[in-house]
Curated annotation (Swiss-Prot):
It is found in: Plastid. One of its GO terms (molecular function) is rRNA binding. Belongs to the universal ribosomal protein uS11 family. It holds the Pfam family Ribosomal_S11. Its main location: plastid. It comes from the Eukaryota. One of its GO terms (cellular component) is plastid. It comes from Euglena longa. HAMAP family: Ribosomal_uS11. GO terms for biological process: translation. Keywords: Plastid, Ribonucleoprotein, Ribosomal protein, RNA-binding, rRNA-binding. This is Small ribosomal subunit protein uS11c. Part of the 30S ribosomal subunit.
Length: 112
């Protein structure tokens, strides 16, 4: 069983696939797929990144997958749908976006 980590930011999408022993099987990002600038955050770019990262995993014989998504980026649903369309069985889906519980003190407010 493989684990897929999808990190989505407002400027890029990075997908890393690891096996049960934490060895990286494949990875891909929007920039590697030749998307530049604001095209990197589109849902289409996310779909291409997912299919490119998981193609080699499918060839190795993995069919079950755990998905972990982090970040506030666009195209989360598109990413999950693309994984299911490729024929993988999704065992778990987690959102691991870090949320601060009143973390660092904010900067002072600007006076106008």
């Amino acid at each position: 069983m493989a684990m897929v980590y999808i990190k989505m930011s407002f400027h890029n999408t990075i997908v890393t696939v690891i096996d049960g022993r934490a060895n990286v099987l494949s990875w891909c990002s929007s920039g590697v797929c030749k998307f530049k600038g604001r095209q990197k955050t589109t849902a289409f770019a996310t779909k291409i990144v997912i299919t490119r990262a998981l193609k080699s995993v499918l060839e190795r014989g993995f069919n079950g997958i755990d998905i972990k998504v982090s970040g506030p980026g666009f195209g989360r649903n598109v990413a999950i749908r693309a994984i299911i369309k490729m024929g993988f069985k999704v065992f778990s889906l987690k959102d691991i976006t870090p949320l601060p519980y009143n973390g660092c003190r904010p900067r002072k407010r600007r006076r106008t």
